[in-house]
Regions:
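Active-site gating loops and adjacent loop-to-helix segments of metal-dependent hydrolytic enzymes
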Residues: 18, 34-48, 129, 214-236
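Active-site gating/metal-coordination segments in enzymes
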Residues: 2-6, 78-79, 83-167, 233-237
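An N-terminally biased module of ancient metal coordination in phosphate/nucleic-acid-related enzymes
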Residues: 1-83
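Extracellular/periplasmic catalytic domains that process cell-envelope and extracellular macromolecules
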Residues: 15-17, 63-66, 93-95, 124-127, ...
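Hydrophobic faces of well-ordered beta-strands that scaffold small-molecule active sites
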Residues: 22-26, 69-72, 99-104, 130-134, ...
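Active-site beta-loop-alpha junctions enriched in small/polar residues
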Residues: 27, 75-76, 104-108, 134-138, ...
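Alpha-helical scaffolding within the catalytic cores
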Residues: 6-10, 51-59, 80-90, 113-121, ...
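Catalytic pocket-lining loop regions of alpha/beta-barrel enzymes
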Residues: 96, 146-250
Length: 250
């Protein structure tokens, strides 16, 4: 049973936003069972929806925290695409509009969905999926793959054809390739994520020059000292000290 009583106000700032929230980066539990040994190649171990995590419990957290909806990245492996989509459709039917489904590659080379697979899923489920990604180019399955690599271009073409958003987490040193694809595909909306792009986004007018380019800002607030790659807002504070000061000052 869901206790969806709203959480009390956490911060001290007089200017306090109380409107709806959208989670722009939600990795959904798997909608299929996969041998753990196989997914060890992806260097992450995912929960299974309705087995380890109930969809209703996700919605309960949304209701408690004022999250209206979320962009949900659903892993769809090439060999299990039919099975994977079944539960995605069920969630959309049961909780319409709460999760905006994106088709996410498996980030395991042998299971990564191919352009023809993506198109077949889109044709079989018209209007269900709104984006493609997250594409994690820093992951081993994509290591050394540039955003403008010939292997990725068909996905951008499909995004253009079906009106999909492309969500990408690039690797370091890929700024020029990022600018190239954004420029060459002006009708495709690109949503980027990751501190790899901070120099380009925060120190240039990249977002101003390209209205089809967006950055999810949540990653700017990530990474507590000794628990991540950077310490942008946290500095040398402990987690507890940061939370206390953040509540006080914001």
């Amino acid at each position: 049973e869901c206790d969806n009583k709203k959480l009390p106000r956490q911060f001290s700032s007089a200017s306090y936003y109380t409107g709806p929230l959208i989670d722009a980066h939600l990795h959904m539990p798997f909608t299929f069972d996969v041998p753990k040994a196989l997914y060890a190649q992806a260097d992450y171990d995912g929960a299974v929806l309705e087995k380890d995590v109930a969809a209703g419990s996700i919605m309960c957290v949304f209701d408690k925290t004022g999250v209206q909806s979320a962009i949900g990245f659903y892993v769809i492996p090439s060999l299990l695409k039919g099975q994977a989509v079944v539960q995605i459709k069920q969630i959309e039917e049961k909780f319409p509009g709460r999760i905006t489904p994106f088709i996410m590659p498996a980030h395991v080379s042998a299971l990564n969905i191919q352009p023809a697979d993506v198109e077949s899923v889109l044709k079989a489920n018209p209007g269900l999926f709104k984006g493609f990604g997250e594409i994690g180019l820093y992951k081993d399955a994509y290591k050394g793959t540039s955003p403008d690599d010939v292997s990725l271009l068909p996905f951008y073409e499909i995004a253009n054809k079906y009106g999909l958003v492309v969500m990408m987490h690039p690797d370091y040193g890929q700024e020029k390739a990022i600018e190239k694809i954004v420029k060459e595909y002006p009708d495709v909306t690109f949503l980027f994520h990751g501190d790899q792009l901070h120099p380009l986004v925060l120190k240039t007018d990249f977002l101003g020059r390209y209205p089809n380019a967006y950055l999810s800002v949540d990653d700017i607030f990530l990474d507590i000292q000794n628990e991540g790659q950077s310490s942008s807002l946290y500095g040398d504070k402990s987690k507890e000290e940061f939370v206390s000061k953040f509540k006080r000052d914001y």
